[in-house]
């Protein structure tokens, strides 16, 4: 970006909707460690609806591998810039920032994030209310309408969950600014990592 090397990580919504599988988590851990070893700032174009769920995910140890990937992200000393393109839900969706040095988070207006997407989450969270209603479909629509009013990305931006909601057309120039800003932070030397789960 603007002549500076960076490590670019992006989600693939065509593979499991962008959800993190055990294999994805292992790739993320290795990628982040490699970028950190070579002092490359990380740019993450995030579209992650969370960890993959189900019997196969359980058998493959998705959560165990996910904790290791998130530990790698959190331990990273290299600067980090995330752009939430679309989805950032659940624990895996929250894995878009490091725990240390310089970290900037942008979101497109299309970005949606939180602990659980409304689609599918409403039935789980409001099952008793929906079942007790005379008209379950109407109750479901009422709950969806109420929650959709709270879903705006501007609410999260106002509480500083992200730094700025940006026009997608400005993304490259913002990322170039990021690369130039963090260039002086590149320091040669050994990266030490703590133990991971």
How would you label these PLM feature ranges?
Residues 1-197:
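Ligand-binding clefts of soluble mixed alpha/beta catalytic domains
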